[in-house]
Swiss-Prot record:
Lineage, opening ranks: Eukaryota, Metazoa, Chordata, Craniata, Vertebrata
Top-level lineage group: Eukaryota
Pfam families to which the protein is assigned, alphabetical: Fe_hyd_lg_C, Fe_hyd_SSU
Function: Component of the cytosolic iron-sulfur protein assembly (CIA) complex, a multiprotein complex that mediates the incorporation of iron-sulfur cluster into extramitochondrial Fe/S proteins.
InterPro entries with a match to the protein in the record: Cytosolic_Fe-S_CAF (IPR050340), Fe_hydrogenase (IPR009016), Fe_hydrogenase_lsu_C (IPR004108), Fe_hydrogenase_ssu (IPR003149)
Keyword vocabulary terms for this entry: 4Fe-4S, Iron, Iron-sulfur, Metal-binding
Protein name: Cytosolic Fe-S cluster assembly factor narfl
């Protein structure tokens, strides 16, 4: 049976793709003990392993297991979490919870919440030849037919990510003379990039990375904190699923930083990709086109959302544009009507500048794909990086081309990507500063923009992964 997760062979069209390391995925430091050999290993008839100590006592050995946390703490691979068997992060796990809700004691039921990314809406819309609004409403109805209680749009949580990125950049810009690592500020929404940074460049690169949570994890905070309180639920009474264009989002959700120790629950319990949603539809024998529509839910009482609402600035979230416009106005009193991009070597590396009196006062860039990311890091290491802010994404062409998106059938990959981009751009856009509900939540939920509660809910931290030298990593 074919694996439900994508593999390296499925990504060969990404010419700068960095595959998993061929060394041991989980190198283990072996501590030598003094004395003679302590035990022998015996293989039983059932294939199990038994340790026999010098006194003749036997102890059955357990099989080694690799968890998502092991992946995060391991320096054996650079990225591509999709090549690892992720048992607790799949659509089968969602089915398991939905089945338990139908068969177990009602007191043990979970309120199931699904939060869908706009990139996933666009990929599904392209596959079924639907407009974005119909796709969102039909997918909402599909999930609710399965037993999901609430379906949200992560465009809402992205408002917080954009606003916090704007505020953080202003703070960093103002302290750049005192803090040499305050700029350039590097975007933090892409978990593939974060994983690469922590494992490969560690303590050198981490101070430059924005502390703002991604929209997925902000949505996790909203659902397990604000929404839970509104519904008189404990965080562990909610099972929160996100639908994402990227397999690395599964790793992001599994970071210890996003685990609530008090209630023993994660902000996001399960991440499924757009491709896995397609498999769910196929498993149910349904075409999304044939599902009757249902409005999206909102985080505000009984209100419903008739259509997805997006943001300007491209299919990866629009971080560069929003931070650039805000910084131009806040720092230099300049209102930017149109952000003009200047492509450099390719469309995945572009620059944006603001000039005053013939001088460049703001110098921004976007860097998509690992080839461009590596070039960016080398500029930083040589002290030749001219940028104040960089929108960094691991996938060439950004999130709309994520590894978890639906693959092309009967058309070229570039043609499909163009259709997905066109559909994504049909959605009505909004400025996060103008969203009344966002301003309301800053007061009611977070108490204040600068509160400790806001810091905990909307920001995170990163961890350099120490390289482990072990005999198990030797190449023969």
């Amino acid at each position: 049976m074919a694996s439900s997760f994508s593999g390296v062979l499925q990504l060969t069209d990404l010419d700068d793709f960095i595959g998993p390391s061929q060394e041991c995925i989980k190198p283990i430091k072996v501590e030598k003990k003094a004395g003679r050999a302590a035990a022998k290993i015996q293989i039983e008839d059932d294939g199990s392993y038994v340790q026999i100590n010098p006194e003749g006592a036997a102890r059955k050995l357990e099989k080694a297991k690799i968890t998502l946390n092991d992946c995060l703490a391991c320096s054996g691979c650079v990225t591509s979490a999709e090549t690892i068997l992720i048992t607790q992060q799949s659509h089968e796990e969602l089915y398991k919870i939905l089945k338990q809700n139908k068969t177990e004691n009602p007191l043990e039921h979970k309120v199931v919440v699904v939060s869908v990314s706009p990139q996933s809406w666009a990929s599904l819309a392209a596959r079924f030849n639907l407009i974005m609004q119909d796709t969102a409403q039909k997918l909402t109805a599909f999930f609710k037919q399965l037993g999901v209680h609430h379906v949200f749009d992560t465009n809402f949580s992205r408002n917080f990510s954009l606003l916090e990125s704007q505020r953080e950049f202003i703070q960093r810009f103002k302290r750049q003379k005192e803090d040499k690592k305050s700029l350039p500020m590097l975007a933090s929404a892409c978990p593939g990039w974060i994983c690469y940074a922590e494992k490969t460049h560690g303590s050198f690169i981490l101070p430059y990375i924005s502390s703002t949570k991604s929209p997925q994890q902000v949505m996790g905070s909203l659902v397990k904190s604000h929404f839970a309180k509104e519904k008189n639920l404990k965080p562990n009474q909610i099972y929160h699923v996100t639908v994402m264009p990227c397999y690395d989002k599964k790793l992001e959700a599994s970071r210890p930083d996003f685990y609530n120790q008090e209630y023993e629950t994660r902000e996001v319990d399960c991440v499924i990709t757009t491709g896995e949603v397609l498999r769910m539809l196929e498993q149910e024998g349904l075409s999304l086109s044939d599902v009757d529509p249902s409005p999206l839910d909102t985080l505000f009482g009984s209100a419903v959302q008739e259509e997805p609402v997006g943001h300007q600035g491209g299919g990866s979230g629009g971080y560069l544009e929003h931070v650039f416009r805000h910084a131009a106005q806040e720092l230099f009193g300049v209102h930017v009507d149109t952000v003009v991009y200047k492509p450099l070597k390719n469309k995945d590396f572009q620059e944006v500048t603001l000039e005053q009196d013939g001088n460049v006062v703001l110098h921004f860039a976007l860097a998509y794909g690992f080839r461009n990311i590596q070039n960016l890091v080398q500029k930083l290491k040589r002290g030749r990086c001219p940028y104040h802010y960089v929108e960094v994404m691991a996938c060439p062409s950004g999130c709309l081309n994520g590894g978890g998106q639906i693959k092309a059938e009967g058309e070229g990959s570039k043609d499909l990507l163009q259709r997905v981009e066109d559909l994504y751009n049909t959605v009505r856009t909004e400025r996060p500063e103008e969203r009344e509900e966002v301003a309301q939540l800053y007061g009611d939920w977070l108490e204040d923009k600068d509160s400790a509660k806001a810091r905990q809910a909307l920001h995170t931290q990163y961890h350099a992964v120490e390289k482990i030298n072990s005999g198990l990593t030797i190449k023969w």
